[in-house]
């Protein structure tokens, strides 16, 4: 592009007092020049037109701050990744696009207002819900740092599911579960910083990080006073999903589950009599099907328990029938040992589960062996079912208290599988162990410690700090519909006794879902207000709107895809003028309608790929709203096919480039 021409154009824009060109704008020397210009020209807004804001915006924010300007009075425009790198063969169009992008940046900057980071004090009291190995590991980790910890367990004693288990895999061997529970429980109960409440449930819980009020009920008796809690760890564990009605489970005592076998093994020794000769285990009962995936630990449990039986009774004939053997690396020694001990493994097809038949009162298991390519009949005195798991009964109650999500099996959903694997969306609440998904002993302990680490951070700092991009509610026109309260993914909006909403700014992430959905339009997002976004829309479409596609891209994934296309030098048509929003859920229907009123050839909204979203439910909210937008456009006589909605990961530059090519082709803009 012709950079000097772009700079000269910028100088001529209304309200622009100074414009300059810098080859290395992020260098120390040029950053110093920016600070000098702010002071010399008494600038009260700054627009940086260079690379992507995803990498360098914090650097320039700090620069303007050092010059005495509020960092939220900076607007960043990407003319490299969005323009010069992707339109290398058409410099004139790239130059014109750069002018438009800068004009859009200036239009928004005019309406920028000062923002500030918000701090919320956090004390040093943590509540751990659940006294299994994950909960005990978390409690010990927190208490060892000097924080007061309250551990609540609804059962009469600590240990959770381990109280029913015989052994656990550990360091290429097994350890007796009762001994593990005894050692862990002793450490917890004797720790000076841990208060243990067994036989106790949560009666009420309300508040937010640094300001939770919790009431307990112990052995049916309610506590008189509420406890002050700053952070919470949910470690409520899981339970075995009983396969009632399958393979005659529940009607024939010879059919048991792996957990019931564990209980038998707890009471067995080498001298124990076992009145069976043939044991068959069927894996993946109620798992790896249309309703749920792999249970993660079933294969390891079946192999471990088969070995335990074989060691106690070497003459036993044991068959393990499986679809796939999914075991973590550290537990593969069990598999080799089992094969060496004579335990037989038979793989059956996904669509052809083993069948149970009775011959003269004895079990016969019919199974198709994939390796042999034929059906086998295996006699059995005991049939052990490796079943799926589900969350504990308390999940519904805890979910309601904390405003968090759980799947259909009652397992809590983390904020993000990669970026927040032990976090809930709301700050100050973590989850661990089998409350999230089935896990082995080692994983549960590690996740308990990870959750402890996460909640320890704000307790050590003494506060949490939120960026200034937050929601602000003007109550003048508020209808008290509570939509913002219901839809906020982060529980950052609270209602008073009159249903009047207010924003807990330290919890708000600035996604904008509430603002876009507010029927009275009385919610503003600092730095992404309707006024600012509308100014960008109108600036983008001021000239030749019939040749332009107006795009809204989320900062986290979609813009990452745009940037990746740029870094990869993927060439696509120059028709798009993109507006950055923090989340696709921020895009209100009225901006789309306005774009078409101004004559836009098309509108594109791109959010995060499903099922992930930086703001948990943002892309789902966007999808629902865009469906409504299409219907409204159709009623207004606008072709709804001119509104494109798509989803893009941060690494998917080729996909974004293809979206642009396809859209230009369909709209006949070539």
Predicted regions located by residue number:
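Residues forming the flavin
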Residues: 1-548, 553-567, 571-589, 598-617, ...
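C-terminal functional segments of enzyme domains
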Residues: 345-348, 648-670
């Amino acid at each position: 592009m012709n950079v000097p021409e772009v700079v000269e154009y910028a100088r001529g824009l209304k309200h622009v007092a100074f414009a300059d060109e810098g080859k290395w704008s992020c260098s120390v020397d040029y950053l110093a020049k920016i600070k000098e210009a702010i002071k010399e020209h008494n600038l009260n807004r700054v627009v940086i037109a260079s690379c992507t804001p995803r990498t360098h915006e914090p650097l320039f924010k700090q620069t303007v701050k050092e010059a005495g300007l509020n960092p939220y009075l900076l607007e960043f425009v990407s003319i490299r990744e969005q323009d010069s790198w992707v339109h290398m063969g058409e410099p004139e169009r790239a130059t014109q696009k750069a002018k438009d992008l800068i004009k859009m940046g200036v239009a928004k900057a005019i309406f920028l207002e000062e923002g500030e980071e918000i701090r919320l004090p956090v004390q040093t009291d943590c509540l751990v819900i659940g006294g299994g190995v994950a909960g005990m590991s978390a409690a010990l980790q927190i208490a060892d740092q000097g924080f007061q910890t309250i551990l609540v367990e609804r059962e009469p004693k600590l240990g959770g599911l381990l109280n029913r288990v015989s052994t656990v895999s550990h360091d290429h061997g097994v350890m007796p579960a009762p001994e593990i529970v005894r050692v862990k429980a002793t450490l917890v109960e004797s720790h000076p910083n841990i208060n243990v409440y067994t036989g106790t449930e949560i009666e009420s819980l309300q508040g937010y990080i640094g300001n939770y009020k919790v009431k307990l009920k112990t052995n049916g008796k309610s506590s008189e006073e509420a406890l002050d809690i700053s952070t919470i760890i949910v470690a409520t564990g899981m339970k075995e999903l009983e396969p009632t009605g399958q393979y005659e489970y529940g009607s024939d005592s010879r059919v048991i589950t792996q957990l019931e076998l564990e209980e038998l093994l707890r009471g067995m020794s080498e001298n124990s009599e076992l009145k069976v000769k043939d044991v068959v285990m069927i894996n993946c009962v109620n798992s790896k099907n249309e309703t749920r995936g792999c249970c993660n630990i079933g294969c390891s449990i079946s192999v471990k328990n088969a070995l335990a039986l074989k060691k106690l009774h070497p003459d036993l004939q044991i068959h393990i029938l499986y679809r796939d053997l999914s075991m973590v690396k550290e537990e593969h020694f069990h598999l080799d040992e089992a094969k060496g001990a004579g335990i037989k493994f038979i793989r059956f097809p996904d669509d052809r589960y083993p069948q149970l038949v009775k011959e003269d009162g004895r079990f016969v298991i019919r199974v198709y062996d994939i390796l042999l390519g034929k059906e086998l009949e295996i006699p059995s005195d005991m049939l052990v079912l490796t079943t799926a798991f589900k969350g504990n009964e308390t999940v519904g109650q805890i979910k309601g208290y904390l405003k968090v999500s759980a799947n259909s099996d009652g397992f809590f959903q983390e904020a993000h599988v990669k970026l927040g694997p032990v976090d809930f969306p709301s700050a100050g609440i973590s989850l661990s162990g089998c409350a999230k998904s089935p896990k082995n002993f080692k994983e549960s302990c590690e996740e308990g410690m990870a959750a402890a680490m996460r909640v320890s951070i704000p307790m050590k700092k003494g506060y949490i700090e939120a960026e200034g991009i937050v929601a602000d509610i003007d109550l003048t026109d508020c209808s008290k519909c509570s939509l913002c309260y219901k839809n906020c993914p982060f529980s950052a909006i609270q209602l008073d006794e009159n249903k009047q909403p207010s924003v807990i700014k330290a919890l708000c992430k600035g996604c904008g879902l509430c603002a876009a959905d507010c029927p009275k339009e009385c919610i503003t997002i600092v730095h992404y207000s309707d006024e600012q976004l509308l100014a960008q829309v109108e600036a983008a479409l001021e000239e030749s709107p019939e040749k332009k596609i107006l795009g809204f891209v989320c900062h986290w994934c979609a813009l990452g895809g745009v940037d990746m296309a740029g870094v990869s030098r993927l060439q696509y048509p120059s028709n798009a003028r993109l507006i950055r929003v923090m989340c696709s859920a921020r895009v209100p229907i009225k901006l789309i309608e306005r774009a078409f009123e101004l004559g836009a050839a098309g509108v594109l909204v791109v959010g995060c790929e499903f099922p992930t979203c930086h703001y948990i439910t943002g892309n789902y909210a966007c999808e629902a709203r865009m469906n409504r937008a299409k219907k409204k456009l159709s009623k207004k006589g606008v072709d709804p096919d001119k509104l494109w909605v798509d989803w893009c990961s941060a690494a998917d530059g080729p996909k974004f480039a293809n979206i642009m090519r396809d859209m230009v082709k369909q709209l006949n803009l070539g």
